[in-house]
């Protein structure tokens, strides 16, 4: 079923409209005016009809096969309101005030009231789209928020939402700030509209009601170390089932029980003689060779290895490995579907303890989300086999990282980025309400549920510009997923917020500044990591491709367009001086020494005592040439798809940004010049989509963790009310290969 689109006009009555003639001697030319008015009205109606037809055709073609949520085989078919459609005026966004396809100006005779802000100040053309949704998404206000008489949200002491700036140099957005005028509602993927409601959760400390936390206070972050005792106490309560090796008897127990008594004695005697003469039975020998452990406690991967009680699991592939152990693709001979993923932990006490923490976290997630609706990997079962803790989970597709590496164009469509962002933030919101901090969010730990995709052959010139590895992996094609549903995995580094906090967490590229600076860390570190992931989906590569602290901090300042706030640097010095909390062992040598104690500013490029620059030229290029302020950096990448006219300045309001872009587009139309074939595809809806995306990133990349936007506030951000027409919408659940 294709989407139904209704197009209509919203008409308003005005007291002083001159659309009727008056009688009397003063109106001698009334008949002429009536004729002209009728002529202009007919001409205008004809132009409007043409515009409606073109818009209707444009939107219908883009939506016809894109968002068919009523297919029986669609896994994302709405579970709630399944047979209801709604008129999506809520998601309306601004259009250009001067539509290009209409050259006729309709004058308002009530000019003396034009400056008056009135709800009926103009005749808007509204495009109303019927769009199914999966869940309702009510507005959740922070505890410190209220609604004033003008139906505006008033927030006090809530840094996540932002406030109006007093300086003209910086523009800071607030929700519902702009009046919506000529509007059009573009489609969104169902995953982009997933809702989140605060619930009552069951957590290990028997606390049933978790109060959604707005942020962390300064004192919490400064002194936060967690409790080792609570971690050890929790791990002691973990009970693991011991999976025994296969019996030395060749017959299974059921078969042995069915043997006559005389035959049973012969069978036992024969097996014992064979066992004692050879030192082990054939089965025991087979088991020993099937599941080997090296001197470092790692399981030695071997295809077709058999392990688990009764030889339940058969190893078929190696999915991943690390310091913790290995992840295997296995056949489960007990349950269907047969293929599962088994995480085999190193047989070392340190990693076994960490696995017990992971097990408690996975069990908490399972208890509170048995259906897996919050995009977290669910634990099937666990057991202990030959001193290896084994965690069994469902098997999904490749990670986002692997998918990007095998793609000719690593960048994701905007609609897919929004869908993935919604799932990630919503999942983290759920985890944070459970008191869980993931600490290691990155593309490698985000799995794609369904890898089916549409492959588009790339132009020869583009293929030739690819690296040899990417060219071979992608076969010269761009892959666009049909369904961007994801699962978050690897809770091996996750912690409960009240338990022990290691001094260093997260993979370097996704590490928050409070961790680098040796400050306390908590829930906000996950938000920073998500922001890094989202930028990577846009630009197709890591935002921070670095391996040491000084370069990392210099890049952070350049991308944020501002130095580190002096108050958090002052806290860093204070914490180091008084030895508060946990600090990285190399904090003084790799971080603190690069800050001036008087100005509290980062000293980069690095200089020696004589004032000579000692930072390498290669490092200088990485910082100065490979990145820029985030809005400028992303704009450069988006120009590849939308032309040179797209430019976003986060210090200017959206209307000012669009005015500048529109001027560029008008100049190009007049001069008939275009540097890109896609330049004319840029419209205001597309610009606003990316503008508010960058605005959300800016709030997620806040240096001060106490002011960084929370997961719950991020779900209410304006960006999630906006749609976009792109390849991600067009290929959603497309039946063609």
Curated annotation (Swiss-Prot):
Function field: Nonessential protein kinase.
EC number: 2.7.12.1
Annotated family: Belongs to the protein kinase superfamily. CMGC Ser/Thr protein kinase family. Lammer subfamily.
Name under which the protein is recorded: Dual specificity protein kinase KNS1
Biased composition (Polar residues): 15-33
Residues with PTM Phosphothreonine: 562
Annotated coiled-coil segments of the chain: none
